[in-house]
């Protein structure tokens, strides 16, 4: 009896061959540009969740590497250079600061006109 586990997610380029080397069969297709961008963003969310769940430094390093891989793929798919991203990163850091001071914003209190 056959079972088919549904994944419906973007995978790294060598995953189909790795699955076949394990004597299994998989069904895949090549995404168009629009769907590729959508699934890259879904993959980024998946990897961010895995970063959040990482419990050791080694796990965190592996998950951060996955995040960087997806970010790089998103850049390439959209014709965005690393320099463009870093430029905006530096502008935002200059304007809004970084995350070095560990500040957690609890709330903003505003006076009402009542």
Labelled PLM ranges:
Residues 1-114:
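Flexible "arm" and connector segments at domain edges
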């Amino acid at each position: 009896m056959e079972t088919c586990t549904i994944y419906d997610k973007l995978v790294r380029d060598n995953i189909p061959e790795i699955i076949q080397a394990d004597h299994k069969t998989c069904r895949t297709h090549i995404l168009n540009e629009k769907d590729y961008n959508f699934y890259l963003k879904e993959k980024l969310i998946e990897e961010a969740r895995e970063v959040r769940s990482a419990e050791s430094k080694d796990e965190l390093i592996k998950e951060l590497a996955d995040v960087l891989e997806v970010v790089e793929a998103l850049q390439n798919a959209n014709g965005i250079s690393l320099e463009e991203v870093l430029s905006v990163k530096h502008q935002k850091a200059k304007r809004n600061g970084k995350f070095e001071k560990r500040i957690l914003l609890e709330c903003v209190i505003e006076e009402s006109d009542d």
